[in-house]
């Protein structure tokens, strides 16, 4: 039985759950542009106020995946997405993007799904452009990039065209809604493994269980207790891990891996060019907090990708990838490969 938008709104006002099939129906209306902007705004705000459930988020992500332009990847082994929800307000350089190069250099395949900066001074798309990467690729070109270089960047607007039907509503509302947490759940290449950073501690347990429902294989959802949507050097990090169908939640500390706890203040940047400079310094093996946090996050991603047996092993592989120059070489490789498709 379908639900009308008005009934769904009433449900959110009463703090009652919208069931799976109902949420599928509502989300399809939104993605097709068949729901009025007023009703769409009211429902997504109502969901936020009552707090979205795991079931509601999983259903919404299922529909977003349905409407996406998919990237077909033949070999799913050691295939990982490194992504953050953003919105953590930390204004750091692009740690997950830097980690992509290290993770690929150490033997994983990385499908990075990202956008321009919204809350940050530099989104993943902005810094990749500053590096010289052509981000405007078709789905088959992204697939070729993953096969050839071990990395592919999927610029979100190219892969989620239906999002234009809710873009104006989201912009005018100006508050976080369910759509802020759907991006990391809707990788167009369907990477079965993931390192996902989130902007709130409550989302660690929620997002990892959403990924469990969506059939993911090995996922680590992380929240740095200093507010970062990354594995942090400045505080303990909360982890929700999905492996072999089971969820475990725990805390990790930099000292667990022989790293020094140090403030993330030195990682702040004002724009994409500053982010590019800091990233290249880390990949060039210049001793810095930037290098250490990239090593930590890439090591965690290598564990998520099942290249490493543990985060500690992953960190060792990441160190070797940076020290050998392989990680830095991956930047030039991605630039060269993507520029051939420049239109």
Swiss-Prot record:
Q: Look up the record and name the pathway of this protein.
A: Amino-acid biosynthesis; L-tryptophan biosynthesis; L-tryptophan from chorismate: step 2/5
| Entry binding sites for 5-phospho-alpha-D-ribose 1-diphosphate | 84, 87-88, 92, 94-97, 112-120, 124
The cofactors required by this protein are: Mg(2+)
Q: Pfam families from the xrefs?
A: Glycos_trans_3N, Glycos_transf_3
Q: Cite a single GO BP annotation.
A: L-tryptophan biosynthetic process
* Binding-site residues for Mg(2+) 2, renumbered to this chain: 229-230
Answer whether the UniProt record assigns the keyword Lipid biosynthesis to this protein.
no
The record's remark on the cofactor is: Binds 2 magnesium ions per monomer.
Instruction: Provide the residue positions that the database annotates as binding anthranilate 2.
Output: 170
* UniProt KW keywords: Amino-acid biosynthesis, Aromatic amino acid biosynthesis, Glycosyltransferase, Magnesium, Metal-binding, Transferase, Tryptophan biosynthesis
Enzyme Commission number(s) from the entry:
2.4.2.18
Highest taxon, organism lineage: Bacteria
Q: What class of enzyme is it?
A: transferase
Q: Where does anthranilate 1 bind?
A: 84, 115
A GO cellular-component term linked to this record: cytosol
InterPro entries reported for this sequence:
Anthranilate_Pribosyl_Tfrase (IPR005940), Glycosyl_Trfase_fam3 (IPR000312), Glycosyl_Trfase_fam3_N_dom (IPR017459), Glycosyl_Trfase_fam3_N_dom_sf (IPR036320), Nuc_phospho_transferase (IPR035902)
- Work out whether the entry's keyword set contains Amino-acid biosynthesis: yes
Q: Which reaction does it catalyse?
A: N-(5-phospho-beta-D-ribosyl)anthranilate + diphosphate = 5-phospho-alpha-D-ribose 1-diphosphate + anthranilate
Q: Which residues form a coiled coil?
A: none
Residue sites binding Mg(2+) 1 per the record: 96, 230
Q: Which GO terms describe its molecular function?
A: anthranilate phosphoribosyltransferase activity; magnesium ion binding
SUBUNIT field: Homodimer.
Q: What role does it play?
A: Catalyzes the transfer of the phosphoribosyl group of 5-phosphorylribose-1-pyrophosphate (PRPP) to anthranilate to yield N-(5'-phosphoribosyl)-anthranilate (PRA).
Family, as annotated: Belongs to the anthranilate phosphoribosyltransferase family.
- Protein name per Swiss-Prot or TrEMBL: Anthranilate phosphoribosyltransferase
The organism is Burkholderia lata (strain ATCC 17760 / DSM 23089 / LMG 22485 / NCIMB 9086 / R18194 / 383)
Instruction: Please spell out the taxonomic lineage of the organism that makes this protein.
Output: Bacteria, Pseudomonadati, Pseudomonadota, Betaproteobacteria, Burkholderiales
């Amino acid at each position: 039985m379908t639900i009308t938008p008005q009934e769904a709104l009433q449900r959110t006002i009463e703090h009652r759950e919208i069931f799976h099939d109902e949420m599928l129906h509502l989300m399809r209306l939104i993605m097709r542009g068949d729901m009025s902007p007023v009703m769409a705004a009211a429902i997504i705000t109502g969901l936020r106020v009552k707090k979205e459930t795991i079931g509601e988020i999983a259903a919404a992500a299922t529909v977003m995946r349905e409407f996406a332009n998919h990237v077909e990847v033949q070999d799913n082994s050691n295939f990982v997405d490194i992504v953050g929800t953003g919105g953590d307000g930390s204004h750091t350089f692009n740690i997950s993007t830097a980690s992509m190069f290290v993770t690929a250099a150490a033997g994983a395949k990385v499908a990075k799904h990202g956008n321009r900066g919204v809350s940050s001074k530099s989104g993943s798309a902005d810094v990749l452009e500053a590096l010289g990467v052509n981000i405007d690729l078709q789905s088959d070109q992204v697939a070729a990039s993953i096969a050839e270089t071990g990395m592919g960047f999927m610029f979100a607007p190219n892969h989620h065209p239906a999002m234009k039907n809710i873009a104006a509503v989201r912009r005018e509302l100006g508050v976080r809604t369910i759509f802020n947490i759907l991006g990391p759940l809707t990788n167009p290449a369907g990477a079965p493994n993931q390192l996902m950073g989130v902007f709130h501690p409550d989302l660690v347990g929620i997002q990892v269980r959403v990924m469990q429902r969506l059939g993911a294989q090995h996922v680590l959802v992380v929240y740095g207790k200093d507010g970062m949507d990354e594995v942090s050097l400045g505080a303990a990090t909360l982890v929700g891990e999905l492996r072999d169908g089971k969820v475990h939640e725990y805390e990790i500390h930099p000292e667990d891996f022989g790293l020094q706890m140090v403030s993330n203040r030195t990682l702040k940047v004002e724009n994409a060019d500053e982010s590019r400079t800091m990233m290249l310094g880390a990949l060039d093996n210049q001793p810095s907090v930037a290098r250490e946090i990239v090593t930590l996050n890439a090591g965690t991603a290598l564990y998520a990708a099942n290249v490493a047996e543990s985060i500690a092993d992953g960190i060792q592989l990441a160190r070797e990838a940076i020290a050998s120059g392989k990680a830095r070489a991956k930047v030039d490789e991605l630039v060269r490969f993507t520029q051939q498709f420049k239109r």
